[in-house]
From Swiss-Prot:
Compartments it resides in: Cytoplasm
Binding site for Mn(2+) 1: D274, D351, E353
UniProt-listed Enzyme Commission number(s): 3.4.11.1, 3.4.11.10
Positions with a binding annotation for Mn(2+) 2: K269, D274, D292, E353
Source organism of this protein record: Actinobacillus pleuropneumoniae serotype 7 (strain AP76)
Any one GO MF annotation of this record: metalloaminopeptidase activity
Family the UniProt entry places it in: Belongs to the peptidase M17 family.
Keyword Plastid assigned: no
Chemical reaction(s) catalysed: Release of an N-terminal amino acid, Xaa-|-Yaa-, in which Xaa is preferably Leu, but may be other amino acids including Pro although not Arg or Lys, and Yaa may be Pro. Amino acid amides and methyl esters are also readily hydrolyzed, but rates on arylamides are exceedingly low; Release of an N-terminal amino acid, preferentially leucine, but not glutamic or aspartic acids
Protein name, per record: Probable cytosol aminopeptidase
PROSITE patterns: CYTOSOL_AP
Gene name, Swiss-Prot/TrEMBL: pepA
Length: 499
């Protein structure tokens, strides 16, 4: 898909399909008003006759509009002008995609980017439009022997901005929107891949692929022998029951003007399949446990977006690849594990494995002397119960970092909600036989999981994103979401802008 921006007059657009908005009730947007004048009231006459009310998502395709050089004019309902939100705007763009795809048009000139979205600028309108279009066109059919009939997709979208002075921002939005959409798609592809293909070795190969593609990326893969030498016993315990060995993939992106600048480190839980181990999960929906590597997928997608945007930062992405399976060699409830930093953990439930993989990974990344560390993981069902499928759970030992992430989440429309940490939650992690227990009981399960991780982050600024509710969708819309690639990408954009 080719995207571009311009500042032009709606009356002069020679294109296969010209798209303008109509507000509710039957109110023309500025671009639609200009077309109506050019067509001598043709559009307003149709609205008076009741052909389109202007409710959000309604569409009306017109051919041969008098005096208009475009082959087609698509009217898109935008709802009430003063109530247009980011969510509604994206839905409107996706309705446009659906309608245009049924016409056979190869090119679209879109004036919907001129709409006023609450608290947003032309930059956001263009970027959100690209993200919404790419989201709408995404499909994953790699393993279907009979491919679905592919609709004839348009190949080019030209976004119009109302003011010439906004063109530079719109061009920047193009760059960011395309890069972030690519990162989201890469994350979704990896997460949707079946676990008999996507195992820890597969994640390691993907990480190596980034290094082969980009000159400023270097990848190092840590195997189980090296993990054992490092004392990563908690990580290795989780892997013991699987025939697929664990691999820790370290992706180093260096593009800061100061090559010695401290890196931002992103850590992703990469459980390519989580059966629960000896504490085995119920069979219902166990197939969705291929998504337990959603954290690693989002780090991979973010590193891809980062490289495409060429941001002047030093960033390290870490994919903690592992598989949790039951067999005669699997770790057990009651086992006590000595972690890389020396703390011991009693295993009360082998299905609380992600935190064991992460605690050693979070210790491992100390060697990079990071500016900050953000880990993301499909960690707890408790977070899904608390926040549902709309907000990722955020925990942090730093108010500054937490606020920066919440700001990026709001900007990117990739929402997060902060949950507390504190010594009172540490009490729930007490063990009679070890320094820590790997679960803290039913109450506050998402928080106690984050609190456990905090014991391994004392040497740097840290935040944790629990994406168990946001990394994928179930039911008829089953599939990975690519979250929180947009949030992380925006966080990195902000970091680059403010240094």
């Amino acid at each position: 898909m080719e995207f571009s921006v311009k500042n032009g007059s709606v009356e002069k657009q020679r294109t296969a399909c010209l798209v303008v908005g109509v507000y509710e009730p039957r109110r023309l947007s500025a671009a639609a008003e200009q077309l109506d004048k050019l067509s001598e009231g043709y559009i307003s006459t149709l609205l008076r006759r009741g052909d389109l009310e202007g409710k959000a998502g309604q569409t009306l395709l017109l051919h041969n509009v008098p005096n208009v050089p475009a082959d087609r004019v698509l009217l898109v309902g935008c709802g009430k002008e003063r109530e247009l939100t980011e969510r509604q705007y994206k839905q409107i763009i996706q309705k446009m995609v659906q309608a245009v795809s049924e016409t056979g048009s190869m090119e679209v000139v879109c004036f919907l980017t001129e709409l006023h979205v609450k608290g947003r600028t032309s930059y956001w309108n263009v970027r959100f439009a690209i993200e919404a279009i790419q989201e709408s066109l995404y499909s994953y059919n790699d393993f279907k022997s009979i491919k679905p009939e592919v609709r004839r997709e348009f190949r080019r979208v030209i976004f119009n901005v109302a003011n010439r002075k906004d063109l530079a921002d719109a061009e920047r939005a193009l760059e960011h929107g395309k890069a972030i959409s690519t990162g989201v798609a890469f994350a979704k592809n990896v997460a949707n891949c079946p676990p008999n293909v996507c195992n820890p070795a597969y994640l390691a190969e993907l990480a190596k692929g980034l290094a082969a593609e980009y000159d400023n990326i270097r990848t190092t893969v840590i195997d189980e022998a090296e993990m054992a030498a490092l004392g990563m016993n908690a990580y290795l315990a989780v892997s013991r029951g699987s025939q697929n060995p664990a691999y820790l993939s370290v992706i180093e992106y260096k593009n800061h003007p100061n090559p010695d600048a401290k890196p931002i480190v992103l850590v992703g839980k990469g459980l390519t399949f989580d059966s629960g181990g000896i504490s085995i999960k119920p069979s219902d929906s166990m197939d969705e446990m291929k998504y337990d590597m959603g954290g690693a997928a989002s780090v991979y997608g973010t590193m891809k977006a980062l490289a495409e945007m060429k941001l002047p930062l030093n960033v390290i992405g870490v994919l903690a690849g592992c598989e949790n399976m039951p067999d005669g060699n699997a770790y057990r409830p009651g086992d006590i594990l000595t972690t890389m930093n020396g703390l011991t953990v009693e295993v009360l439930n082998t299905d609380a494995e992600g935190r064991l993989v992460l605690c050693d990974t979070l210790t491992y990344v100390e060697r990079f002397e990071p500016e900050l560390v953000i880990d993301m993981a499909t960690l707890t069902g408790a977070c899904m119960i608390a926040l549902g499928a709309h907000n990722s759970g955020l925990m942090s030992t730093s108010n500054v970092l937490a606020n920066d992430l919440l700001n990026a989440a709001e900007q990117a429309d990739d929402k997060a909600w902060r949950l507390p940490l504190g010594e009172e939650y540490q009490e729930q992690l007490k063990s009679n036989f070890a320094d820590l227990a790997n679960i803290g009981g039913r109450l506050g399960g998402a928080i106690t999981a984050g609190q456990l991780l905090s014991n391994f982050t004392k040497k740097y600024v840290w935040a944790h994103l629990d994406i168990a509710g946001t990394a994928w969708k179930s039911g008829v819309a089953k599939g990975a979401t690519g979250r929180p690639v947009s949030l992380l990408s925006q966080f990195l954009i902000n970091k680059a802008n403010n240094q």
